[in-house]
């Protein structure tokens, strides 16, 4: 074990002098010596980011750097940050270092793993084509999820990423009897609190491990907390289990990387992001994968700055995903929730060889009808509906019904909406949209399709409206 001395401290960046022959390696964890000061955080951990030469290393503090000063003693641990893994983590809330923050005693785990691991080799990977039913109509129809696949929920501020994530947790984690890991990366503490109570009420808390590095924490914590959660998920996967891994929010992971990069003095690249953006994203995403022993199905919320999907951060995330669910402010403005854009969202699974001919034909029929409506909108706005041909009028009427039928009451939003949540099986989703596209519902008013589950409910609602 090598001992060092703090020589410079600028915010979260701390430079430490070691003897030249005992320089710690990159990513090694260092801790503040116990007898240093009553003002600094006890047992503060620092992670080596750069070797500056002459025995000096540049580190990022994984905690508050308040109270640090030159001359303080630092001890090298000789290893990267390691966190507890295994069944002892289930039902617990931990921080980036795997320490419990739920005041429920120490974590009982015999094994610790370093948060920096190599991604599985190519010959260990196992591609999956099995569908994962979510019970959310628009997702199951247009951008179906694969078991063991990666899903991104893209959306600007306030269009419903977290609510959609919570509904997916509600529908998948409760139905799927397996284990889940939730990583809260730079999000609101209130959301983490709500999530904990939601899991507790639904009696699935003992199947979820939670790791949080929230908005108010230093950039080092927010940058590493996704890796901590992933390390816990990898352990369960390597035991041969099928794991669900939820990350809210990947953009904050990128943002923490930007902050750390600026503090380390790197030259920024496009839009001020770190020059290592693609590499950092790759390091995380390449590890979130399914092997021949077990699978990780990951669902990641991705904040889109200023609703610009071409921003480097969401654009870098796109290429790693199997399904992309794009939430649109225009659709949210119409009062249609979930505000998923069926023309912008996509999935590799939407292939007739995977989902079957009927599902594929219905999904494409729905998209074609909506696309036709989108093209006709300008004409309708200028000249009105009367100027359209009979075929176009019919297409518009069906598109408006489809648009409303894509809405659905959520279980997690019951407290706000007052209407009970609906879980719609995939077969019912396909049957409902097939009937609308084929013109079997042309006689029904479009209001009958708003916020219902199955097509049968739409028929019942139509009777009440008449």
From Swiss-Prot:
GO terms for molecular function: ATP binding; ATP hydrolysis activity; proton-transporting ATP synthase activity, rotational mechanism. Keywords: ATP synthesis, ATP-binding, Cell inner membrane, Cell membrane, CF(1), Hydrogen ion transport, Ion transport, Membrane, Nucleotide-binding, Translocase, Transport. It catalyses: ATP + H2O + 4 H(+)(in) = ADP + phosphate + 5 H(+)(out). It is found in: Cell inner membrane. GO terms for cellular component: plasma membrane; proton-transporting ATP synthase complex. ATP binds at residues 155-162. Its EC number is 7.1.2.2. It is a peripheral membrane protein. HAMAP family: ATP_synth_beta_bact. PANTHER family: ATP SYNTHASE (PTHR15184), ATP SYNTHASE SUBUNIT BETA, MITOCHONDRIAL (PTHR15184:SF71). F-type ATPases have 2 components, CF(1) - the catalytic core - and CF(0) - the membrane proton channel. CF(1) has five subunits: alpha(3), beta(3), gamma(1), delta(1), epsilon(1). CF(0) has three main subunits: a(1), b(2) and c(9-12). The alpha and beta chains form an alternating ring which encloses part of the gamma chain. CF(1) is attached to CF(0) by a central stalk formed by the gamma and epsilon chains, while a peripheral stalk is formed by the delta and b chains. Produces ATP from ADP in the presence of a proton gradient across the membrane. The catalytic sites are hosted primarily by the beta subunits. Belongs to the ATPase alpha/beta chains family. This is ATP synthase subunit beta. It comes from Bordetella petrii (strain ATCC BAA-461 / DSM 12804 / CCUG 43448). The lineage of its organism: Bacteria, Pseudomonadati, Pseudomonadota, Betaproteobacteria, Burkholderiales.
């Amino acid at each position: 074990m090598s001992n060092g001395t703090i020589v410079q401290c600028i915010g979260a960046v701390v430079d430490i002098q070691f003897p030249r022959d005992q320089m710690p390696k990159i990513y090694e964890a260092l801790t503040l010596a116990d007898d240093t000061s009553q003002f600094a955080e006890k047992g503060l951990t620092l992670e080596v980011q750069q070797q500056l030469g002459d025995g000096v290393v540049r580190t990022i503090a994984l905690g508050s750097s308040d109270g640090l000063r030159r001359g303080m003693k630092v001890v090298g641990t000789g290893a990267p940050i390691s966190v507890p893994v295994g069944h002892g983590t289930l039902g617990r809330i931990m921080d980036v270092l795997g320490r419990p923050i739920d005041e429920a005693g120490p974590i009982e785990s015999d094994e610790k793993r370093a948060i920096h691991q190599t991604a599985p080799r190519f010959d260990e990977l196992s591609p999956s084509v099995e569908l994962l039913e979510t019970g959310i109509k628009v997702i199951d129809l247009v951008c179906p999820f694969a078991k063991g696949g990666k899903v991104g929920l893209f959306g600007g501020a306030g269009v419903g990423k977290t609510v959609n994530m919570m509904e997916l947790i509600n529908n998948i984690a409760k139905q799927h009897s397996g284990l889940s890991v939730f990583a809260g990366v730079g999000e609101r503490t209130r959301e983490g609190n709500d999530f904990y109570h939601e899991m507790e009420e639904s009696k699935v808390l003992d199947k979820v491990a939670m790791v949080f590095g929230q908005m108010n924490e230093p950039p080092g914590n927010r940058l590493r907390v996704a890796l901590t959660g992933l390390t816990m998920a990898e352990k369960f996967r390597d035991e041969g289990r099928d794991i669900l891994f939820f990350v809210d929010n990947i953009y904050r992971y990128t943002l923490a990387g930007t902050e750390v990069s600026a503090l380390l003095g790197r030259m920024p690249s496009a839009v001020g992001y770190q020059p290592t953006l693609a590499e950092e994203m790759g390091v995380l995403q390449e590890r979130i994968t399914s092997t021949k022993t077990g699978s990780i199905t990951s669902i990641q919320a991705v904040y889109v700055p200023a609703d610009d999907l071409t921003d480097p951060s969401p654009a870098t995330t796109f290429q790693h995903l199997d399904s992309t669910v794009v939430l649109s402010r225009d659709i949210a403005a119409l009062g249609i929730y979930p505000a998923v854009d069926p023309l912008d969202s996509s999935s590799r699974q939407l292939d007739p060889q995977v989902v079957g001919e009927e599902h594929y034909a219905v999904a494409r029929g729905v998209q074609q009808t909506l696309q036709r409506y989108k093209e006709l909108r300008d004409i309708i706005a200028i000249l009105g509906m009367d100027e359209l041909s009979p075929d176009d009028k019919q297409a518009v009427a069906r598109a408006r019904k489809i648009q409303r039928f894509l809405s659905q009451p959520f279980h997690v939003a019951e407290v706000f909406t007052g209407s009970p949540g609906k879980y719609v099986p995939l077969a019912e989703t396909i049957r409902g949209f097939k009937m609308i596209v084929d013109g079997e519902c042309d006689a029904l008013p479009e209001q009958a399709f708003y916020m219902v589950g199955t097509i049968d409910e739409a028929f019942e609602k139509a009777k009440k409206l008449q």
